[in-house]
């Protein structure tokens, strides 16, 4: 080996080894301080890509587990509401069993029906107000998908169903059955509306006290008075909803036949543009709500327009029937909010929207459809019959026969077979609850499986990117020793050129 001064090969070699040990020491210290074997892609490029995919799966599955727990919470919330609905149905069934006992008086049956009605209203309230995070869970049918996986399409569907009185088949449920109506039936009809209206027919004056629902006659000899809503329902919660009220006075004529006159106030309930049909003839309401006596109802008959004002109606025009429309301009009707149709069997049958008058002119039955509900008037019978829906009639005069029936099969079935109806409703609630219970078990299973998967993925990722402290501590110790040795050797290597100077002495 040549003896040179300019190039110290031993020093350069020592420095190179010292740099290597320094790099190893830095890497070991970085891994020990971070706990990771892979701190950047240069540490292990392939391992970093694999570990990153594991991280995506782990994070997605962890969130999916939380989603599944939310699904359990939704199912539990819904089932809790259904449990309350079930409790109310059980009470309704208990009351229905009590009502079928023949020892009950009319007062007992009314009390039972009142509690049943409250229970049914509570079922509707629970249905409308139960929600989870702003989502109503019983007010409509809904297929709610819960993401329980890290990839697209990995979902479990919760089948939320609408559960209320109507969907349970209990709309119009009545264990009290048909009964004769009295003035007492009117007293809660307009409980949320204040004020009264006074109408006159001839010499007689009538006043409807809307606040109490009572009907008052100002003359000494009260005639038969009907109070009805033109839209087929008396009950109203808002004075602004324009529910029309008609008063009908029925007296016995000299010829022994029943005569009816109407006191017009119902036209105030219509709104401009509303129409009604009679025997294919369409009437259009020209009056606006709150108009005076100049408000109009118009149609075209045989190519000629027929117009009536409120004042015309108030004079007591004749009832509408097929013959009237086909041969005369003398047309009378009450006005409603929306559309209605008469369905007369003969030309001579007479019918009004808000009341079906049973008299000598009625042959068989006349039928009227109001907002989708059908009612019939029959010349036979001597009682006012209520079945199912809200319909209040005051029948106080003698010698007049009126029969009003609701043509609703569901209501009749409920009244005839109350226990079967309740059992059917309970079965539906049980089916929904069973479905929710099964879905909760599915979520529990999914959560367990997700937990196992996340654990295994974490283990696999750890083997790739986590630092092995035993190995790294050993590497650090080795690097430290090499650093110390290298530093000492470098000092010796740097002294080699000094030895060359001895040759010059």
UniProtKB/Swiss-Prot annotation:
It comes from Salmonella montevideo. Flagellin is the subunit protein which polymerizes to form the filaments of bacterial flagella. Keywords: Bacterial flagellum, Secreted. Transmembrane segments: none annotated. GO terms for cellular component: bacterial-type flagellum; extracellular region. It is found in: Secreted; Bacterial flagellum. The keyword Secreted applies. Individual Salmonella serotypes usually alternate between the production of 2 antigenic forms of flagella, termed phase 1 and phase 2, each specified by separate structural genes. It comes from the Bacteria. InterPro entries: Flagellin, Flagellin_C, Flagellin_C_sub2, Flagellin_N. Disulfide bonds: none annotated. One of its GO terms (molecular function) is structural molecule activity. PANTHER family: FLAGELLIN. Belongs to the bacterial flagellin family. This is Flagellin.
């Amino acid at each position: 080996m040549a003896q040179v001064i300019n190039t110290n090969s031993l020093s350069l070699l020592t420095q190179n080894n010292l740099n290597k040990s320094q790099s190893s020491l830095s890497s070991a210290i970085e891994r020990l301080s971070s706990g990771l074997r892979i701190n950047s892609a240069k540490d292990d490029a392939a391992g970093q890509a694999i570990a990153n995919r594991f991280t995506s799966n782990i994070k997605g599955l962890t969130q999916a587990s939380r989603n599944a727990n939310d699904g359990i919470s939704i199912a539990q919330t819904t089932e809790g509401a259904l449990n309350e609905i079930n409790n109310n149905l059980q009470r309704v069934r208990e009351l229905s069993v009590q009502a079928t006992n023949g020892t009950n008086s009319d007062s007992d049956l009314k009390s039972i029906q009142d509690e049943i009605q409250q229970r049914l209203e509570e079922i509707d309230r629970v249905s409308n107000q139960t929600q989870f995070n702003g989502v109503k869970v019983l007010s409509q049918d809904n297929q709610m998908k819960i993401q329980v996986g890290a990839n697209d399409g990995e979902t479990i569907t919760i089948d939320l169903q609408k559960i209320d009185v109507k969907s349970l088949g209990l709309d119009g449920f009545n264990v009290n059955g048909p009964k004769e109506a009295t003035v007492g039936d009117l007293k809660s009809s307009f409980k949320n509306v204040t004020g009264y209206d006074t109408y006159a027919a001839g010499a007689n004056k009538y006043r409807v006290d809307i606040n109490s629902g009572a009907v008052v006659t100002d003359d000494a000899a009260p005639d038969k008075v009907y109070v009805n809503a033109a839209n087929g329902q008396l009950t109203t919660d808002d004075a602004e909803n324009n529910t029309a009220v008609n008063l009908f006075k029925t007296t016995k004529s000299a010829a022994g036949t029943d005569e009816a006159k109407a006191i017009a106030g119902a036209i105030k309930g219509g709104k401009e543009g509303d129409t009604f049909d009679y025997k294919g003839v369409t009437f259009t309401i020209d009056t606006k709500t709150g108009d005076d006596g100049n408000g109009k109802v118009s149609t075209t008959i045989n190519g000629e327009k027929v117009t009536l004002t409120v004042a015309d109606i108030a004079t007591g025009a004749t009832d509408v029937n097929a013959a009237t429309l086909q041969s005369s301009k003398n047309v009378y009707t009450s006005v409603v909010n929306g559309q209605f149709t008469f369905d007369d069997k003969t030309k001579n049958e007479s019918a009004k929207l808000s009341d079906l008058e049973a008299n000598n002119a009625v042959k068989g039955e006349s039928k009227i459809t109001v907002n989708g509900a059908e009612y019939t008037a029959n010349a036979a019978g001597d009682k006012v019959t209520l079945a199912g829906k809200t319909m209040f009639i005051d029948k106080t005069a003698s010698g007049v026969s009126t029969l009003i029936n609701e043509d609703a099969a569901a209501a009749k079935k409920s009244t005839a077979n109350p226990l079967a109806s309740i059992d059917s409703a309970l079965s539906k609630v049980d089916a929904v609850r069973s479905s929710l219970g099964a879905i909760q078990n599915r979520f529990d299973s999914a959560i367990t499986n997700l937990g196992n998967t996340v654990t295994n993925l974490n283990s696999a990722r750890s083997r790739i990117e986590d630092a092995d402290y035993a190995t790294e501590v050993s590497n650090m110790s080795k690097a430290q020793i090499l650093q110390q040795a290298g530093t000492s050797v470098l000092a010796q290597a740097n002294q080699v050129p000094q030895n060359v100077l001895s040759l010059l002495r």
